[in-house]
From Swiss-Prot:
Official protein name in the record: 3-aminoacrylate deaminase RutC
A GO biological-process term: nitrogen utilization
Function of the molecule: Involved in pyrimidine catabolism. Catalyzes the deamination of 3-aminoacrylate to malonic semialdehyde, a reaction that can also occur spontaneously. RutC may facilitate the reaction and modulate the metabolic fitness, rather than catalyzing essential functions.
Keywords annotated in UniProt: Hydrolase
Organism for this UniProt entry: Escherichia coli O157:H7
Lineage: Bacteria, Pseudomonadati, Pseudomonadota, Gammaproteobacteria, Enterobacterales
Amino acid sequence: MPKSVIIPAGSSAPLAPFVPGTLADGVVYVSGTLAFDQHNNVLFADDPKAQTRHVLETIRKVIETAGGTMADVTFNSIFITDWKNYAAINETYAEFFPGDKPARFCIQCGLVKPDALVEIATIAHIAK
């Protein structure tokens, strides 16, 4: 099965040569996602909960465009700029995964824009 490019309606053009997601063999791979507006400006500077919510809503759009749901998420890679935001990010993250939680990792690192606090890349298995 060839891969399909997943670009939800209203998506902004990425800052680099990539797409929001790809679908191959029933697996959705969602690119690293930040809290950007349509012009790739960071939204909600200094608000880790709002950034996390925006990131996960964007990820949900990619997965739903591919035909899945957030319940299909099997793995998240989480990148944060400061451990002081870890609890706030987890609080919002848990709202999107109320049942069985996906596997994940979380590391502290620098991100592509100074006001970005969290970036998440996701894998979801939607094959039935």
